[in-house]
Structure formats: C-alpha cells, structure tokens
C-alpha cells in the first residue's frame, strides 16, 4: 500500500490518549474524535509524552496546520508539526527522538530554552524536511546531522547557532538550505554550490568567509548572502549561476564598488538586492549591464547621487527601492511611464520636484509610493488612480490637500506629516485606514465623516490649528487603535465616551483647551482596557482620581514578555504587493526631555498627566501597570505620599512627580526598580534621603530632603525617619481594604450623617478644611 497519510489533529489524538486505559487523563476536550485507527497505541503514547514535556498554553487549538500524521499501512508517525506552540527545554532524552520513521518535522517558532542543540536529531535518519527555525537553539550544529541522508529541506534560520559551516555537503538530496540570521563563521565549503539538487541557499546574516566554486549546471535559483561581511571571492562566481531568479547581496561591507556587469549574464534574474553597497556610477548609466528580466530592484543606501537611467529599459520592473541615497534634482517624468511599476520608494533623498508635467502620474500603475524626507516644494500633485498607500511627509509641500484624493477609491494610507499644508481636512477620508497629517497648518474642525467607512485604525492630526470639539462620530471608528490630536485648539471636556472603542491603544490629547474632570462619575475606574499610551498634558483638567482609577487597564497590566520589542507596525497584504509598513509617531516627555518617538512599542506603556490641575492622592492602582515605562504627573497639585505600589511597576524607566505637593519620604521600593534611569521629585514637600545616582536637580525644592546628591547633610532635625510612613498593604489585585471598610461601616455611617448635618446647617470653615484633609490623605 502506498504511503498515504491521515492527518490527525493533536488535540483529538490526546483525547484518545486520555480515554485509554494505559494513560491518565490530564485534560478534557470537546473536539470531535477523528478516525485514529492509523496510529498505533505506542505512537499515540509517545506523542502524548512528548507534548507533556512542554508548556503548551500558547498552542492555537484551531490551527489546522498543527498536528500529527500517521502512515496508513504501518501506523507510525511520519509527520509532526507543532508550530509556535511549545515552551520549555528540549532534552536529549526527549520522546521526540523515538519517532524514527519521521519524514516531516516542523518545530519552528517555539520557545525552546535548551542551551545546546540536541545531537539526537541525527537519529531521525528518515526525515526529509526539518524546520527548526525561529527558536532559541545555541551552540554548534552536531556532526550527527550528516546522518540525515534523506534530507531535502533544512531550515535553521533565526537561532543563535555558532561554529563553522555545518557538515551538510554529503546530504546530496538537499534542495533547500536556510541558515539565515545565526552566528556561523568560518569558511563556506567551496563545493557547496556544486550540490546537484540545491535550488535555495540562504546564508544571510552570518560571518562566513572563503571562496565558492560554481558549475554552470547548478540548479540554484535563490541565493541570499547579505547583511554581514562575506570575505572572499564570491561575486565573480555568482555570475555563472545562470539559473538564478533571486539574488540578495545587501550590506556585504566590501571595500570596492559593485559593477552591475557582474549580473549581465543572469538572464532569468527577477529580484536583485544590492542595498548597502557602493555601486559603480558607470554601470548605472548603461543598460548593457543589467538583466532586462528584473521585476524587483533594491538599491537602498548605495550612495547614488543621480537617478539611474538604466531603469528606462526595465519594462518588467514592478518594485524599486532607491531610498536613503543622495539623489538630488527632479524625479524624471519617464519613470511614471514604466508599464508595470506598482511600488516605489524614493524616500530620504534630496529631490526638489518633478520633471515635466505631473499629470502623467494620474495614469501610472503606481499603487504604493514613498517620497517622504526630501525637499519637494509646491502643491501636491494629483495622485495615481490606482494608489493604495502614499507617503510624502517631511517635505515642503504647501497649499490645500487636493480634493482629487476623494476619487482614489483604493487609497488606504495617506501620510503627509511635516509639510506646510493649509485649509481644512478633506471630508472624504472615510475609507482610509491610516491618516497621518501631523505638523501642518490645517485648520477647521475634525470632519464628522472620518469614520463613515469603519476602517480607520490611525488618526494623527497633532500640531495643527484644529479647533472645535471632538466629534462624537469617532464612536463609529470601531477599528481605531491610535488617536492623536495634540497641540491643537480643541475645546471640550474629557471624552469618556471613547471607552466604547474596543481597540484603542494610544490616546494623545495633550496641549489643547480641554477641561473638567478626567475621573468617571461616582469615582469608578477609567475603562480603557486596551490603552497603552495616554497623554493629556498641558490642558485644564481638574479634580481627583480614585484609588482604583487604573484597575481596568488590562493591557498595560500585563507583564512584558520576550516579545516585548515588537513595534506597533501595521502590515496589510490587502494592498496586493509588498506589505505597506506604517509606524506611528508620538511626541512625549521622557526622562526630563521632550522628544519625538517615531516607533511605538507594542509593549510600550506611558502616562502623561503633567501640566494640569489635578489634586488629591496619586491612585494606588498605578502599581498594577506592570508594563508602564514612563509616568509623568508633574505640575499638578497631587498631595499625600508617593504610593508604595509604584515599586510594582517593574518596567518603569522614567518617573516625574515634580512640582506637586507630595509629602512623606521617597519609597525605598523605587530603589529596587532596575530600569529606573530618571526620577524627578523636585519642588514638593518630601523629607528624608534620596535615590543615589540621580542629579541633585531631581530633588531640589524639598526642604526636608537631605543627603547626597544634595548638599544638605542628614543630621539633627534633618535626620531621615527610621521607617517609611505606615500605609495599608497594597496588593496587585486589590487596592482597597474592603474588610476594614465593612468593619467600620456602621460607626462610620452614623458619624458621617452627623458631620453632614453640621456641614449642611452651619458649614464651619474649620470643619470643612478637616474633612478636605481626610478626603485626600486618609
């Protein structure tokens, strides 16, 4: 019987194990039981044991690509795929290595904590496809890999593997070899490209040296060698790989300019990336030196100073990246006539305008066009009818945003920040996903129609002359994640109603004319569960904040994990070609400085309430925000002690509580925050000692503070207290002591009624002041 395969979802497989008399039930599942006859019982038990070796809470149980397959005739496991599922240590004695008949194994994107690469993989000598990419494997690839004689695909990319080139030369069936982004070094075997079936080779991001031998009979079609220095003679032999279709040689760090003549013999080449290398100016002027088959050409950061005329002849060109060069002058008119050109980046150059009439743009085939960070002046041209994403920020465009964009039905992303546009925001942007108009001279009110299409994810109109109120129609933006209207002239109360937006992560309202309380009625928590960045600085907000103000900030309460360096980057393949990547920008006060943050981390959490009229205690629930990176409450009227719970904000890097009326001592717990690089508590009423390592300006203006870095010594009446002021215990999940509240309820109620009667009848000033003091500092 032929080796047909029966796909078995691993959850269903575990269900059979759990009802088997030979295994104990650890889980219960509601999934339907599939026909498991093909898998023998000992194979089921081995798989169950393997899965139980790891934490599997990350497993996506609805992902039908994950699972286990058994051969119909033998009943043994021949295919196993657990992608982005497992956490733990892959030990040499793992039951994984019992599956000697495996032909396909995919364990990519897991979180293995092994310190070395298990040599037992070499025992799986029937495996044909092995994917261990995007894990945490370290050390050298064991020599036992040379036993995998049936291997056709080996994926080891994005690990931390070291040592010399793995011993794979005798694996003559290999067609796909991927070592991208590791730490391999040493010499590449000269015969590597002589392997008879090798069609894909990715050595990108390593430290290899040596020369390579090439045969014209090589079947290699895809070759990636870029990012790290590759010492040795490799460029000339590459010209003999006549079957190449994709070639990546970016950032080789070679000392001489590349001559495009090297690639003239590659008649099948469709993709060429030479970014980060110097290109011979002569070869950029002649069309004799470049394959006419090219569809994608990347020449980013190549030191090019004039637009290459060779592009005229590339009639099949679909994508070109000429960003981060030194090209000046005007963008040539013929460029828009290339019949297939759909995506182009000319960003970060010195272009100052367009050659000839810009009307030719309208009928071009362009879908994605980046021309930000140039010196282009004048009115914005009419965009191509096919445009989907357009970025032209950081130029000198002026005049009004043309209403012709209303007829661009495919337009999803419009980015025009840092220009000199005037007039009003067009009413017709309702179908866009990203609107970025920051730092222009736009005026009028925010259009009510912005959310008519319910697709808006980012709206950034900060630093303009916008007036009026925040339109309630923003409630229709159910997909909105990023809203920035800072530094305008908006006059309104705090938009509590925005809490209805389920995906809102960033809310920037700073430097407007907003006023009133920011605490919900009845002192309930502020309900923005997904909010990460909340900036309302320099307005006229007033009132107090309840101790439970931040209780419902669920996203910011999550602990930062190992994936905490991901940016808030949007990738939308709906554009139909290479993903459009957009990075949100915020202006923030961080470590005492005002700065622009162009990339907002997914795990990044910041609060800025500075420059308002807020009073009372700082909410103790602030300690629940474990992801909080920056907190600025300066220039308000907060009183009482700095909450001890701040010590629970373990990711805190910047803390500014200056120019308030805070009293007591600086909590010792702040000294344990390993990331806290900046603290400013100046101009308060604090006493005791400071945190060593900060500048003295961070503590000045507190008459009761003494010791380094201040000049005042701690002696006599200025000696610090022996212990912190006693406060109630502050747990992460409970910010009020409800037992104490319940115990004193009866007595407190009677006393409260009596005091209320006195106040209502006579309102003596002395009693009102006492009640006010207890209200804020109890």
Swiss-Prot record:
Alphabetical keyword list: Cell membrane, Glycoprotein, Leucine-rich repeat, Membrane, Receptor, Repeat, Signal, Transmembrane, Transmembrane helix
Where is this chain primarily localised?
A: membrane
The entry's cellular-component GO terms read:
plasma membrane
Q: Which residues point to the Cytoplasmic side?
A: 761-778
For side Extracellular, which residue ranges?
25-739
- Give residue ranges of the LRR repeats: 99-123, 125-147, 148-171, 172-195, 197-219, 220-240, 241-265, 266-291, 293-313, 314-338, 340-363, 364-387, 388-407, 408-429, 430-453, 455-477, 479-500, 501-525, 528-552, 601-625, 626-649, 650-673, 678-700
Amino-acid biosynthesis among the record's keywords? no
Q: What is this protein called?
A: Receptor like protein 28
Q: Where in the cell is it found?
A: Cell membrane
InterPro entries given for it?
Answer: Leu-rich_rpt, Leu-rich_rpt_typical-subtyp, LRR_dom_sf, RLP23-like
Residues carrying a glycan: 60, 72, 93, 106, 111, 147, 170, 173, 253, 348, 363, 396, 407, 420, 431, 476, 632, 648, 680
Alphabetical list of Pfam families matching this protein = LRR_1, LRR_6, LRR_8
Signal peptide bounds: 1-24
Q: Which GO terms describe its biological process?
A: response to mannitol; response to salt stress
Topology relative to the membrane: Single-pass type I membrane protein
Transmembrane in keyword set: yes
Task: List the PANTHER family.
Answer: LEUCINE-RICH REPEAT RECEPTOR PROTEIN KINASE EMS1-LIKE-RELATED (PTHR48061), LEUCINE-RICH REPEAT-CONTAINING N-TERMINAL PLANT-TYPE DOMAIN-CONTAINING PROTEIN (PTHR48061:SF46)
Similarity section: Belongs to the RLP family.
Q: Which domain of life is it from?
A: Eukaryota
What stretches pass through the bilayer? 740-760
Induction remark: By NaCl and mannitol.
């Amino acid at each position: 019987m032929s080796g047909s395969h029966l796909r078995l979802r691993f959850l269903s497989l575990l269900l059979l194990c759990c009802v088997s008399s030979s295994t104990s039930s650890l889980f219960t599942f509601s999934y339907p039981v599939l026909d498991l006859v093909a898998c023998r019982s000992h194979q089921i038990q081995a798989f169950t044991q393997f899965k139980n070796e790891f934490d599997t809470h990350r497993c996506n149980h609805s992902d039908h690509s994950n699972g286990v397959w058994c051969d119909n005739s033998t009943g043994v496991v021949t295919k196993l795929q657990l992608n982005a599922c497992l956490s733990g240590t892959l030990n040499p004695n793992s039951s994984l290595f019992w599956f000697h008949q495996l032909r396909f194994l995919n364990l990519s994107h897991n979180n293995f904590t092994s310190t070395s690469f298990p040599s037992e993989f070499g025992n799986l000598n029937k495996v044909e496809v092995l994917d261990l990419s995007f894990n945490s494997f370290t050390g050298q690839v064991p020599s036992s890999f040379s036993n995998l004689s049936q291997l056709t695909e080996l994926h080891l990319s994005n690990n931390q593997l070291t040592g010399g080139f793995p011993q794979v030369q005798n694996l003559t069936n290999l067609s796909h070899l991927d070592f991208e982004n590791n730490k391999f070094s040493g010499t590449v075997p000269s015969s590597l490209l002589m392997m008879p079936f090798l069609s894909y080779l990715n050595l990108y991001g390593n430290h290899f040296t040596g020369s390579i031998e090439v045969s014209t009979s090589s079947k290699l079609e895809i070759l990636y060698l870029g990012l790290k220095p590759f010492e040795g003679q490799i460029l000339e032999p590459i010209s003999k790989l006549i079957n190449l279709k994709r070639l990546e040689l970016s950032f080789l760090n070679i000392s001489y300019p590349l001559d495009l003549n090297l690639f003239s013999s590659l008649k099948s080449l469709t993709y060429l990336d030479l970014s980060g290398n110097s290109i011979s100016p002569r070869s950029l002027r002649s069309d004799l030196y470049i394959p006419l088959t090219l569809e994608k050409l990347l020449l980013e950061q190549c030191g090019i100073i004039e637009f290459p005329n060779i592009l005229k002849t590339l009639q099949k060109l679909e994508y070109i990246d000429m960003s981060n060069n030194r090209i000046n002058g005007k963008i040539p008119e013929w460029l828009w006539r290339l019949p297939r050109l759909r995506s182009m980046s000319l960003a970060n150059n010195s272009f100052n305008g367009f050659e000839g009439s810009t009307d030719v743009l309208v009928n071009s085939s362009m879908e994605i066009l980046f021309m930000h960070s140039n010196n282009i002046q004048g009115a914005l041209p009419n965009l191509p009818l096919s445009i989907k994403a357009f970025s032209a920020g950081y130029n000198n465009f002026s005049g009004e945003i043309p209403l012709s964009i209303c007829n661009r039905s495919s337009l999803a992303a419009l980015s025009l920040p840092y220009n000199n546009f005037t007039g009003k925001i067009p009413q017709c942007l309702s179908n866009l996903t990203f609107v970025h108009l920051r730092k222009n001279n736009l005026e009028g009110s925010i259009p009510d129609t912005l959310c008519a299409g319910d697709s808006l994810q980012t709206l950034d109109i900060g630093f303009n002359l916008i007036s009026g109120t925040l339109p309630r129609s923003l409630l229709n933006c159910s997909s909105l994640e990023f809203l920035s209207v800072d530094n305008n002239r908006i006059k309104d109360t705090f938009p509590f109603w925005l809490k209805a937006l389920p995906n809102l992560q960033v809310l920037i309202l700073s430097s407007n004319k907003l006023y009133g309380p920011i605490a919900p009625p009845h002192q309930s928590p502020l309900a923005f569960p997904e909010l990460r960045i909340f900036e309302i600085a320099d307005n006229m907000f007033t009132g107090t904040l309840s101790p439970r103000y931040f209780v419902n900030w669920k996203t910011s309460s999550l602990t930062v994990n190992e994936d905490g360096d991901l940016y808030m980057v949007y990738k939308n393949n709906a554009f139909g070609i290479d993903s459009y990547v957009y990075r949100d920008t915020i202006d923030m006060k961080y470590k005492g400085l005002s700065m622009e943050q162009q990339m907002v981390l997914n795990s990044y959490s910041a609060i800025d309430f500075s420059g308002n009229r807020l009073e009372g205690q700082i909410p103790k629930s602030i300690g629940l925000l474990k992801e909080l990176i920056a907190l600025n409450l300066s220039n308000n009227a907060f009183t009482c002690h700095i909450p001890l719970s701040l010590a629970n904000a373990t990711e805190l890097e910047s803390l500014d509580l200056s120019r308030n009326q805070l009293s007591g001592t600086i909590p010792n717990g702040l000294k344990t925050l390993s990331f806290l690089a900046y603290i400013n508590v100046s101009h308060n009423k604090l006493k005791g000692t400071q945190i060593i390592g900060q500048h003295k300006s961070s503590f000045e203006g507190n008459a009761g503070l003494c010791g380094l870095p201040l000049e005042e010594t701690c002696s006599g009446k200025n000696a610090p207290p022996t212990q912190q002021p006693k406060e109630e215990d502050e747990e992460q999940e409970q910010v009020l002591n409800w037992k104490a509240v319940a115990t004193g309820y009866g007595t407190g109620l009677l006393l409260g009624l009596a005091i209320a009667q006195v106040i209502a009848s006579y309102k003596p000033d002395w009693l009102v002041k006492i009640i006010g003091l207890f209200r804020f500092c109890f």
